[in-house]
């Protein structure tokens, strides 16, 4: 049996073939650490924990990297409000998220790089893009030339001309093209900054991930993952940067999980419709959140409400009730039948998981087996 993965880049399921036989390199975008994490963040972490666990079950050696964005406008704003250093804010919420990962029984990543730890490499990456004509400095900032990269828009399916139409008003006149994006931002009073050839400043969000992925996993990776809200502009821009730097396809497979929804809308800090991981774990066990995800398709939106939580709790209870010695009731005939059913259940499990990690079907087969 071969594993098939839905690739956002091709918009279809593809046979899974790794760059190096038996090994998987996987980069998953982590949180921007400026506030308490919510169950939407947990969903992405759990989805790729499930992916990793299955790949390892199938015999692959997985190197899994998840980053922390620890320099960002939102972190800086939070620090100003509290009157503390931005690194104090970042460390506070990194520590909290690390604990949440343990509470949720998520396997530790191979590495957890931070943007501030890769500043030398980030500056070198920006300089390389300038040297190759893909970027240009302007008044202390550095911008990426989207028109220079012929594949821009291939992940999201957008065309530059169509995107430009939405940027007719309040366009930064320093940009050569309205869709050009910042690789480096010149320093502002009171903000953290680092010295660079273009003056003191800090990196843009997108270049951070390109560089962290490269320094941890190399020029090419097997899987790049994250929430589907990151497809554009973040992952689109990562492709443009990384492939411009190295002249190779960046990631073979782009995997995106759906969003956790509350009251019919994406769970978001900016909107305010969220449930923190802390508050969830005060009322429910961690396994219930994992079961909610297992009962659904990872690429689809997941509604968070009392009904879905209760359904997950009942499913857990059913599984736990089956965790006892299977004693045949009718002699050896029943034992042989049970063994045959267990073989078929495993085959169904593998077939479902090989089909783009179809955990919903997997759980269906598992519950059918539990009934026996």
Which residues fall in each region the model found?
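Helix-loop elements that line ligand-binding/catalytic pockets
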Residues: 302, 308-372
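Alpha-helical recognition segments enriched in aromatics with Gly/Pro capping
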Residues: 1-34, 49, 120-327
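Short catalytic-loop micro-motif centered on adjacent basic/acidic residues
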Residues: 64-65, 110-113, 224-226
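Short, polar/flexible loop-turn hinges at active-site or ligand-entry regions and domain interfaces
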Residues: 82-88, 109, 299-303
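Short, glycine/charge-rich beta-strand/loop segments that flank catalytic centers
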Residues: 68-72, 94-97, 107-122, 140-149
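N-terminal, positively charged nucleic-acid-binding surface of large information/translation enzymes
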Residues: 10-13, 19-105
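Active-site pocket-lining segments that scaffold enzyme catalytic pockets across diverse folds
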Residues: 97, 102-108, 126, 130, ...
